């Protein structure tokens, strides 16, 4: 798999935009990443077990991507870690403490930016901050390349700009764990790759732990230290991505990891036997990159 011209152009553009942003956030001012441990977690809905004895760890500052087919339990796991729902069995800890006691260290970024339409961009970023930290919100907005949009209304922003504001709103609280629930799924190809570069740059600079849920295997390879595959509520694969950063989408090593993960996903495709390779690849493309869907839970 070689990088196409659209990807190449997007990567070049992303690099240019990143060089233009300010850098008010730094590792020196951040608390650092948190150690995540999901221990034997079970989650049921209406008697049906969605997650079965999940064991997952993330070291402080590690970037872990979770992939899998629709309905496998990816977003459910993220909601449990975020504290939006409770596990039926098992435990989730951050730095060996119950996750519920460290909720102030967790922030979630969704596919829907969830900006308040009646507040301007800077006011959205500053939500929940004391008045004396308003300048900090402006600095973080500059960090994501939107200094000149501080007084704009959300309705005037593009999809990519709205997600940049959502990212700034998360980072202004200095999270030690950033949870990303398909935050780029509704963006066009150029904007998606640009946002990947921005997220990676800020993660490397600030050192927070990141957990990304995505249907896009290429995105997982581009961003993650490890790729975890969930199948039928179980962890079926845990692949380390041993590639130098920033990742080169068109490299042979990148393509090999991407293909290996896709093949592993396709092994579990319903009725895969007897289906041609081209049909399987088409099914994988459809199932691993989804369009916008409604958000079913509140922050």
Swiss-Prot record:
Protein's membrane topology: Peripheral membrane protein
Cellular component terms per the entry's GO annotation: plasma membrane
Places the protein is found: Cell inner membrane
SMART domains membership: AAA
Principal localisation: membrane
Catalysis: reaction(s): ATP + H2O + aliphatic sulfonate-[sulfonate-binding protein]Side 1 = ADP + phosphate + aliphatic sulfonateSide 2 + [sulfonate-binding protein]Side 1
Binding, ATP: 68-75
E.C. no: 7.6.2.14
An example Gene Ontology molecular-function term: ATP binding
Assembly: The complex is composed of two ATP-binding proteins (SsuB), two transmembrane proteins (SsuC) and a solute-binding protein (SsuA).
UniProt similarity note: Belongs to the ABC transporter superfamily. Aliphatic sulfonates importer (TC 3.A.1.17.2) family.
Functional summary from the UniProt entry: Part of the ABC transporter complex SsuABC involved in aliphatic sulfonates import. Responsible for energy coupling to the transport system.
Name of the protein described by the UniProt record: Aliphatic sulfonates import ATP-binding protein SsuB
Lineage of the organism: Bacteria, Pseudomonadati, Pseudomonadota, Betaproteobacteria, Burkholderiales
Gene name per UniProt: ssuB
């Amino acid at each position: 798999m070689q990088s196409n011209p659209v990807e190449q152009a997007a990567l070049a553009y992303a690099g240019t935009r990143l060089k233009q942003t300010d850098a008010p956030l730094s590792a020196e001012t951040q608390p650092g990443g948190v150690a995540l441990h999901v221990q034997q977690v079970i989650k049921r809905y209406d008697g049906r077990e969605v997650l079965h004895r999940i064991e997952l760890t993330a070291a402080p500052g590690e970037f872990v991507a979770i992939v899998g087919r629709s309905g496998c339990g990816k977003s459910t796991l993220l909601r449990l870690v975020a504290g939006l729902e409770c596990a039926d069995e098992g435990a989730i800890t951050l730095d060996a403490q119950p996750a519920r006691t460290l909720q102030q260290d967790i922030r979630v970024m969704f596919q829907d930016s969830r900006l308040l339409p009646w507040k301007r961009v800077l006011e959205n970023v500053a939500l929940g901050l004391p008045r004396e930290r308003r300048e900090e919100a402006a600095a973080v907005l500059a960090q994501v390349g939107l200094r000149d949009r501080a007084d704009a209304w959300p309705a005037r922003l593009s999809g990519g700009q709205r997600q940049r504001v959502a990212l700034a709103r998360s980072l202004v609280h200095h999270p030690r764990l950033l949870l990303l629930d398909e935050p780029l799924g509704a963006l066009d190809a150029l904007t998606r790759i640009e946002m990947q570069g921005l997220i990676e740059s800020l993660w490397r600079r600030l050192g927070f732990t990141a957990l990304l849920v995505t249907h896009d295997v290429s995105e997982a390879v581009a961003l993650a230290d490890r790729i975890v595959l969930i199948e039928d509520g179980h962890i079926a694969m845990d692949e380390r991505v041993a590639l130098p950063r920033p990742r080169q989408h068109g490299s042979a090593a990148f393509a090999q990891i991407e293909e290996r993960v896709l093949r592993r996903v396709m092994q579990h495709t319903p009725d895969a036997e007897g289906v041609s390779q081209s049909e399987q690849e088409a099914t994988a493309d459809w199932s691993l990159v989804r369009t916008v869907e409604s958000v079913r839970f509140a922050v």
